[in-house]
Curated annotation (Swiss-Prot):
Subunit field text: Homodimer which binds Holliday junction (HJ) DNA. The HJ becomes 2-fold symmetrical on binding to RuvC with unstacked arms; it has a different conformation from HJ DNA in complex with RuvA. In the full resolvosome a probable DNA-RuvA(4)-RuvB(12)-RuvC(2) complex forms which resolves the HJ.
Ligand binding (Mg(2+) 1): 16, 148
Catalytic activity: Endonucleolytic cleavage at a junction such as a reciprocal single-stranded crossover between two homologous DNA duplexes (Holliday junction)
Named cofactor requirement(s): Mg(2+)
Record field: transmembrane: none
Cell cycle is among the record's keywords: no
Protein name, per record: Crossover junction endodeoxyribonuclease RuvC
Species this chain originates from: Rhodopseudomonas palustris (strain BisB18)
Cell compartment(s), UniProt: Cytoplasm
Amino acid sequence: MSAPPIRQPIRILGIDPGLRRTGWGVIESCGNRLVFIGCGSVEPDNDLPLASRLLEIHHGLAKVLAEFVPAEAAVEQTFVNKDAGATLKLGQARGIAMLAPALVGIAVAEYAPNLIKKTVIGAGHADKAQIQMMLKILLPKAEPKTADAADALAIAITHAHHRGGALLRLKAVQA
């Protein structure tokens, strides 16, 4: 009789991209157990030109990647709003959020906002207060100081629950 497989903890970085504030959250997942590792946000100087703000986001995420050394990363997909200019700028911040982990060889999964809410809360249309309340249950040691950091933790939790399918899709696209 063979022994059951040993589950190794996997460190996951969740990123909630934004031009004013990019949230990040790091958890470890082992089976169905989640452990809070860290969270915060990168807040570039809004008075800087766009390219400099994007560079600050990249530098901030690079520091997080170096400090916490995640094995996988996940980013929230962008929704399109009425302001096309704002959507394009958010897309640029999202590009940086996907590029930073990719530059160090980390696969990046993407999740729709409704799937993140459904995974964490159980319903696809939840507000930020509901997400923060559920984070206290799922990650009792987490005390995110910003809604963006809380959202990033929710993204990491979503990846922990859906990572098998997301990684298979990533490998299929890369093949």
